[in-house]
């Protein structure tokens, strides 16, 4: 089982760096096994990639869904998930922006469904805060779109600019977002 895990970890990192163009020979080399040994664990490169994606989907949505009761916790939770591993950020960018043709539509459908569920959770929190009089009313859809646009922008900035202390940027953006929506 240890070899299987190493194969998956290697494929994860190689997909993040190279996209679908990584080879099983590279995976085998990183793991320290022969290419043929990979087939004892996975039927094909596509099956390996499918399992890698499915595992990351579960980990990502499990981790970020731990803090669903507060907008600020969700904001920092998503950003911190990626801040802890640039490989994860690259993996998700490649998966969402340049999905491999070999990936089944069902996997991308699952990503979109889970993302839509998270969007609804944020929207419900915004509506709840609005009803409590803490934030402006009748702007829940716009605030939700702004919330996720800020997160996606910060994540892209991390890849483009490699800021020295991205956490400071998170704090500045969060504070400005909150100031713009609070009553």
Model-derived features: positions:
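Hydrophobic/aromatic residues within well-ordered alpha-helical segments
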Residues: 45, 52, 56, 60, ...
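Hydrophobic/aromatic-rich alpha-helical bundle segments in the mid-to-C-terminal region
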Residues: 93, 112, 130-176
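Hydrophobic alpha-helical connector segments
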Residues: 51, 62-88, 143-147
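Short, Lys/Arg-enriched anionic-surface-contact patches
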Residues: 1-3
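Amphipathic alpha-helical packing segments from all-alpha helical-bundle domains
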Residues: 65, 103-132, 141-145
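Helix-turn-helix
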Residues: 6, 10, 14-47, 51
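C-terminal peripheral helix-coil segments that are non-catalytic and often amphipathic
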Residues: 73-84, 120-128, 156-183
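Amphipathic alpha-helical segments used for helix-helix packing
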Residues: 84-106
């Amino acid at each position: 089982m240890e070899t299987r895990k190493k194969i998956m970890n290697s494929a994860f990192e190689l997909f993040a760096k190279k996209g679908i163009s990584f080879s099983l020979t590279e995976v085998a080399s990183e793991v320290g096994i022969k290419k043929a040994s990979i087939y004892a664990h996975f039927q094909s490169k596509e099956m390996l990639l499918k399992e890698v994606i499915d595992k990351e989907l579960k980990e990502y949505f499990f981790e970020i869904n731990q803090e669903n009761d507060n907008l600020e916790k969700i904001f920092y939770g998503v950003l911190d998930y990626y801040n802890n591993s640039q490989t994860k950020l690259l993996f998700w960018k490649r998966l969402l922006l340049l999905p491999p043709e070999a990936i089944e539509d069902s996997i991308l459908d699952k990503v979109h469904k889970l993302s839509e569920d998270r969007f609804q959770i944020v929207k419900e929190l915004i509506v709840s805060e609005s009803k409590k009089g803490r934030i402006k009313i009748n702007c829940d859809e716009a605030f939700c779109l702004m919330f996720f646009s800020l997160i996606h922008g910060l994540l892209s900035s991390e890849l483009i600019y490699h800021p020295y202390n991205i956490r400071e940027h998170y704090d500045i953006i969060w504070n400005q977002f909150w100031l713009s929506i609070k009553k």
